[in-house]
Amino acid sequence: TTTTFLQIASSRSGRALLTKETGISSPKLLHWARRAELMKIKDLGRDYADLLEAVGVESVSELRRRNPESLHESMQKINIKAKIVERMPSIKRVNRWIEDSQHIEIKVSS
């Protein structure tokens, strides 16, 4: 499950074990773990996570530091070019993601 994956992949030693067992690189596992942690935020699914990644937000800690208006504007600009999502999230939703990110316990370490 995602929960089990996060428990194991949240640490370097866990990722090393997974790399040994699966052959998947540690950086790829770290990316997936950060993505899974980010997707714990309500209404933030895969497509929106892809859009956030396109503007440089790849983790909960990065989302926490963002200004909602600037982030929303960057997301709009990228989405016009790359067409990542069909429906842009509202500024209210982006603001809620940032607020909700404050309450997510970050377990994934670099």
Show the residue positions of the predicted features.
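C-terminal extensions
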Residues: T1-S110
